[in-house]
Regions:
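Short, small/polar residue-rich loop motifs at catalytic or cofactor-binding pockets
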Residues: 26-27, 45-47
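A generic structural signal for residues embedded in beta-strands
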Residues: 42, 60-61, 83
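Glycine- and acidic-residue-biased ligand/ion/polar-headgroup-sensing regions
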Residues: 37, 48-61, 77-78
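Cyclic-nucleotide recognition modules
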Residues: 71-121
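Cyclic nucleotide-binding regulatory module and flanking cytosolic helices
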Residues: 1-36, 80-81, 85-90
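Short phosphate-coordinating micro-motif centered on Lys-Gly-acidic
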Residues: 39-45
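Cytochrome P450 core scaffold surrounding the K-helix E-X-X-R motif
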Residues: 61-67
Length: 121
């Protein structure tokens, strides 16, 4: 494994970025580990972070009128989780919990938008 792969391995989802941009991305990110059955976010929570699932499995779900769990989507890392909520500046429309132990990178979306989405380059 080369030094760039070691340094940015968790960010391979963004491998198309230049090294200086990957450094910027790391500066606005926090890596967290979660255990099976922990909650990442609840329906109605504000979408402050872009969530990059590095490893593990999550489920997005809601409840029907009889309070039965309705699974909307399962994701296996690496994957972005409910990123459309960030783009649309909406609160989450579902809950997200972990089906396995997992690692997630939380990217400050406001800073991400300023650094990467609103620049013409």
């Amino acid at each position: 494994m080369d030094s760039i792969s070691k340094k940015y391995g968790d960010y391979k989802y963004f491998s198309f970025l230049e090294e200086k941009d990957l450094d910027k991305l790391k500066d606005i990110s926090i890596k967290k580990t979660y255990k099976k059955d922990e909650i990442l976010f609840y329906k109605g929570d504000e979408s402050k972070y872009l969530h990059l699932l590095v490893s593990g499995i999550v489920k997005l779900y809601t409840h029907d009128f009889k309070d039965n769990e309705v699974v909307i989507h399962n994701l296996i890392g690496p994957a972005l989780i409910a990123e459309i909520m960030n783009y649309e500046e909406m609160d989450f429309l579902a809950n997200c919990s972990f089906d396995t132990d997992a690692e997630v990178i939380l990217i400050d979306y406001k800073k991400f938008k300023e650094e990467f989405l609103q620049k013409p380059e």
